[in-house]
Amino acid sequence: VTGVQTCALPIFRAIENVRILGPVRKASQVEVSATDAIKLGMKVPVRESGDVKGSAPIAIVGPKGAIYLNEGCIVAMRHIHMSPKDAQAAGVKDGDIVSVKADNERGTIFNQVKIRVDDSFTLEMHIDTDEANAAKIATGNTVTIIK
């Protein structure tokens, strides 16, 4: 055989020491940061937690075996959990999309932040590690909804 040929080999990329969290959902899901997705060599959609239909496939390997999910890997959409009382005070309702300002040395504004309201929620914004690191935000910092 002459000419240039292409050989393809399976490449195993992994993120080790991943925490498994509850509560149990209707469908298994894995939330990764955009950086994790790049490391894994995957195209992962940004979705609201629980919205896994048509999302990226992923394997989960543990000490007692492995499972393969045909779909279920997402980058979680940034969101704020709040109680109905907090929502009323902020002038927002469940499902609203707002902007949030981190008024620190990075001066970051996060757009497309979904409001999630439930009696069981404590006021807290959820962003991934990429977003937190870029904006120099840590647990306990305060941000402002600017709508």
Give the ranges of each region predicted by the language model.
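Beta-strand/loop-dominated core regions that host nucleotide or nucleotide-derived cofactor-binding catalytic loops
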Residues: 16-84, 97-147
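Short, small-residue-biased leader/transition segments that mark boundaries at the very start
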Residues: 2-9
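Structural and coupling elements of P-loop NTPases
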Residues: 11-14
